[in-house]
């Protein structure tokens, strides 16, 4: 009995699910019927509108051509009627003269005959009949106004519904990725004059293969593209790849999307590490503000920290000389910077390759520095004052100056102070260059040999700055590095 009840419950559950499935399908069918009715009305209205437009064009053409025929007829009629009137008057004059000549010829008076003959001769000389052109000024032919609409009629007879556009194909070999721009190039299998525009979709991804059902980033849409290529500019490359697909559209319908194509968008991406920054710095992912009250909220903790760091095991000197394997990392909870080291590090190490990032800072900051540091940078160390960091330093305390600093040596830079600095690091070559990012003017280059991974490093006192990552090394910087490979700007020039 219990088994039968359980079996019946399963049947009831199955029937209920099937009924719900059928009900959902019925709702879907009803919605499809409504959509079909609405779509049919829409396309019928569009069809009637198109034919009305076509009729209007034909009516306008007919009216224009009929008007030209009427104008041509009126012009020729005027010419022929004018010529006819002149000829009629000339004929009347000639007939009168002929009658007068006949009468004179029959006259028996010799005296009057001589004078009359002389007058007739003079009249004939001046008669309009002898000054008229007997060639018609206008032709009666209207053959040049004939028409033959056979070709147009055939075209009209070939009118049909718009075909669905073919699927484009993206040519990976012709696509380009450089200077944070992406150029995508595609073609259609066959030329199609009815294509009105293209729609390009793109999205960021960290997966090289085909798009996944669930991605972290949505498709972004670019509409109204008239050519078979498009360039995205000013893209922040904060993922490893970007996926693209494109479809063609005629006036009324869009075709299928092309096969997605994934392009590599390599760039250096990092965030600022708030966990190890100085407490007077208010740190967001990519920006920092000076906070004078930041270090006062945990006075007791700071005192305990000072007591702990006074021991030989935690002295600044020992911290600065620790082995890289034991050194605190920006990724794994290193000690906070303290005292006058108003420093914040990036959260990503550089141990290979060429990288570029930019920083925009408040030029009214009392002090600001940007560069790179070793993982072993001590928590009391200021940027540029030890052999574990290289930086460019802005000082606004007494007199504004811009200096390059490393290992407590400095060189004043003779240049205008920019508000945005580009930083280029070539780990293998041991090159660290600073640029005015507005015009890519080289400010200074350090040449060294990195023995350990380095980290983006920043310092600010009474000011603020923001970092822009996800940038490729600009091509102008790469070409400039080749030209300036023997530049005198180096560690040796610091004094």
Curated annotation (Swiss-Prot):
Q: Which residues carry this modification: Phosphoserine?
A: 490
Query: Does the keyword Nucleotidyltransferase feature in the UniProt annotation?
Result: no
The Gene Ontology biological process annotation of the record reads:
cell division; cilium assembly; Notch signaling pathway; regulation of cell division; regulation of mitotic spindle organization
Q: Where in the cell is it found?
A: Cytoplasm, Cytoskeleton, Microtubule organizing center, Centrosome; Nucleus; Cytoplasm; Cleavage furrow
An example Gene Ontology CC term for this record? cleavage furrow
Which terms are listed as keywords in the entry? Answer: Cell cycle, Cell division, Coiled coil, Cytoplasm, Cytoskeleton, Microtubule, Mitosis, Nucleus, Phosphoprotein
Which residues lie in coiled coils? 4-99
Q: Note down the stretches annotated as region Disordered.
A: 306-332
Provide the B30.2/SPRY domain boundaries: 281-476
Q: State if Phosphoprotein is listed as a keyword.
A: yes
Molecular function terms in GO for this entry?
microtubule binding
Q: What does this protein do?
A: May be involved in microtubule organization and stabilization.
Record remark: domains: B30.2 box contains a microtubule-binding site.
Q: How does it assemble?
A: Oligomerization is required for binding to microtubules.
Q: What is this protein called?
A: Fibronectin type III and SPRY domain-containing protein 1
């Amino acid at each position: 009995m219990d088994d039968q009840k359980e079996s019946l419950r399963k049947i009831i559950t199955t029937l209920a699910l099937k009924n719900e499935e059928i009900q959902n399908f019925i709702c879907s069918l009803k919605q499809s019927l409504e959509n079909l009715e609405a779509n049919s009305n829409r396309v019928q209205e569009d069809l009637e509108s198109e034919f009305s437009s076509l009729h209007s064009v034909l009516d306008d053409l007919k009216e224009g051509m009929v008007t030209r025929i009427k104008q041509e007829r009126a012009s020729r009629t005027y010419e022929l009627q004018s010529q006819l009137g002149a000829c009629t008057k000339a004929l009347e004059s000639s007939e009168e003269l002929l009658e007068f000549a006949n009468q004179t010829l029959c006259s028996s008076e010799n005296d009057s005959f001589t004078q009359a003959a002389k007058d007739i001769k003079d009249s004939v000389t001046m008669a309009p009949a002898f000054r008229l052109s007997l060639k018609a000024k206008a032709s009666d032919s209207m053959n040049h106004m004939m028409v033959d609409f056979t070709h147009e009629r055939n075209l009209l007879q070939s009118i049909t519904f718009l075909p669905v556009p073919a699927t484009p194909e993206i040519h990976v070999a012709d696509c380009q990725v450089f200077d944070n721009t992406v150029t995508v190039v595609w073609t259609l299998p066959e030329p199609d004059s009815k294509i009105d525009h293209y729609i390009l979709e793109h999205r960021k991804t960290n997966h090289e293969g085909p798009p996944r059902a669930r991605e972290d980033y949505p498709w972004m849409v670019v509409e109204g593209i008239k050519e078979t290529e498009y360039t995205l500019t000013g893209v922040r490359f904060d993922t490893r790849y970007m996926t693209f697909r494109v479809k063609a559209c005629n006036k009324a319908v869009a075709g299928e999307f092309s096969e997605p194509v994934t392009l590599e968008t390599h760039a250096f991406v990092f965030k600022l590490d708030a966990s190890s920054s100085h407490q007077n710095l208010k740190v967001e992912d990519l920006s920092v503000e000076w906070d004078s009250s930041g270090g006062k909220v945990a006075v007791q903790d700071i005192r305990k920290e000072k007591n702990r760091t006074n021991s030989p095991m935690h002295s600044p000197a020992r911290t600065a000389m620790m082995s890289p394997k034991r050194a605190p990392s920006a990724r794994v909870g290193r000690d906070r910077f303290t005292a006058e080291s108003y420093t914040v590090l990036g959260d990503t190490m550089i141990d290979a390759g060429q990288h570029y990032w930019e920083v925009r800072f408040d030029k009214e900051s009392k002090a600001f520095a940007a560069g790179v540091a070793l993982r072993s940078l001590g928590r009391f160390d200021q940027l540029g004052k030890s052999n574990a960091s290289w930086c460019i330093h802005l000082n606004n305390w007494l007199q504004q100056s811009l200096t390059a600093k490393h290992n407590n040596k400095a060189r004043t830079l003779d240049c205008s102070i920019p508000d945005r600095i580009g930083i280029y690091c070539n780990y293998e070559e041991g090159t660290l260059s600073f640029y005015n990012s507005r015009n890519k003017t080289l400010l200074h280059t350090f040449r060294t040999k990195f023995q350990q991974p380095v980290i983006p490093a920043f310092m600010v006192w009474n000011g603020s700055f923001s970092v822009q990552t996800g940038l490729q090394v600009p091509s102008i910087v790469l070409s400039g590095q080749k030209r300036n490979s023997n530049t005198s700007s180096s560690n040796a020039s610091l004094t």
